[in-house]
A protein has these predicted regions:
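Surface-exposed acidic/polar loop and edge beta-strand patches at domain peripheries
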Residues: 1-109
Length: 109
């Protein structure tokens, strides 16, 4: 198994993103980034089967969630309010109608 990294660019917020490559002896290769744990590419016999973009900026501006890793939750949390026990947490409101969508402005997707 070969593992290596390459720079992927800089986000609008000035954070550096990295690509992580994993390749086995058969040539199957996965490419991920630390920007939202996004799957950039998955190749079998030299053919990429993942739909996505070429630049970090494209991933920042997308609305389709290509390559996104679902984490914490998927979908909306109404009005960005999450109750755990007796405590209510106000989350960022990044979706329609003030909902928190897919982890907020910065997250898995």
């Amino acid at each position: 198994m070969k593992i290596w990294t390459e720079p992927f660019g800089t986000t609008k917020a000035g954070e550096k993103a990295t690509k992580y490559f994993l390749e086995n002896s058969d040539g199957t290769r996965a490419v991920l980034t630390d920007f939202g744990v996004t799957l950039l590419s998955l190749s079998f016999a030299g053919k990429d089967v993942v739909l996505g973009y070429d630049t970090i900026r494209d991933y920042e501006e997308q609305t389709e969630y290509f390559g996104a890793t679902v984490g914490r939750f998927a979908g909306p949390i109404p009005y960005g309010k999450l109750q755990v026990g007796e405590k209510v947490y106000q989350l960022t409101q990044n979706g329609d109608f003030g909902n928190n969508m897919h982890g907020g402005f910065t997250g898995f997707s």
